[in-house]
Amino acid sequence: PAGKRDKGEDFIETAKRELEEETGYRAEKLVKIFEIYPTPGYTDERIGLFKAEGLEKGKIHFDEDEDILSEWIPEEKVFEMIDNGEIKDGKSLIALLWYKAERLKNGA
């Protein structure tokens, strides 16, 4: 999930809201992994990447102007999709490759 912060909202609040709106899941806990600047020198935009823990299925709440497909993809398939160049979104690639590195580091 991704989205803009509402006025007065911090990164965690935005991440929780966007997770539920776009996937239908609620997280018991969100852990900030890191912040990235997608285009330094061009804009001061920051993107916060989070790990969700304790997921509970709820209901998806897409905004009317959003064209989003939300589906569960098995882990093995996700990494095949990366290898095949099917996932092109930079922030998604960073988050997924971080996840893979963590799994390798922890012997999984």
PLM feature spans:
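Short small-residue beta-strand/loop micro-motif enriched in glycine and branched aliphatics
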Residues: G58-H61, E80
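Conserved Nudix-box catalytic region and its N-terminal flanking loop in Nudix hydrolases
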Residues: P1-R17, F34, I60
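Helix N-cap/coil-helix junction residues
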Residues: G24-Y25, I87
